Amino acid sequence: TGTIAFLLKLKSSYSFVDALTRAHSMDEDIWKGLMANWHGIDVLLSPDQPAHGVDLQSDATGVLQFAGMIYELVVVDTNVPFGPWALSIARQSDELLLVTTNELSCLQAAQKALAYFDRNRVERSKVRVVVNRFSKDVGLSQEVIEAALHTEVYHTIPSDYETISRSLVEGRAAPSATPVGKSIQQLVEKLTGKAIRSESPKPSSLTNLFGFLRR
């Protein structure tokens, strides 16, 4: 959807679609040419124009395997859990974050996603349920979510509309001193098993993540 490019103020003439079309002849020089760079981090962006049919027809295995040979850690953001494209990513992933909210309609969608993974033999053990925009005062409780999904909630990210809205307007990630920023940092530490060392007094949570990736 272009969110990463918007948040990081990145532009590139290439996207993951170019990586897919060159997957069989990919080498490190071609790969580096496709990347946008943000503070030393390689970012493979989505195309400026919607890539019709990619989610249904493509397989990300070759691209992910190549990326895995270059980097210690690869983060992939996909918009839907269904179809060969999403399944190829799920099967290649060591850990799979299923992001939902505590609204009833989103919980139903999460149930469908988990059932789809089960039918297609994606190991349930690597699925991590993350509840975004969570509020104890509004919506379903964590206990209800866990009972409905038959799995534990791995992490909750608090509802923090004001911080997120300001960050989007300013084109930056949520500061790590805010509730949502702290929660994202905690999620990164849980996934990596390593504490993040702050490199400046007021870093953003996304900067902390990329700081870890650089090490």
Give names to the regions the model predicted.
Residues 1, 25, 49-51, 80, ...:
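Conserved nucleotide-binding/hydrolysis micro-motifs of P-loop NTPases
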Residues 1-43:
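Phosphate-binding loop that captures ATP/GTP phosphates
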Residues 46-86:
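Phosphate-binding/switch loop-helix module in NTP-utilizing enzymes
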Residues 93-111:
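Conserved Switch II/interswitch segment of TRAFAC-class P-loop GTPases
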Residues 107-126:
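Conserved C-terminal guanine-recognition region of P-loop GTPase G domains, centered on the G4
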Residues 133, 145-174, 184:
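Beta-strand-loop-alpha "switch" segments that mediate conformational coupling across diverse proteins
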Residues 169-215:
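NTP-binding/hydrolysis catalytic cores, primarily Walker-type P-loop NTPases
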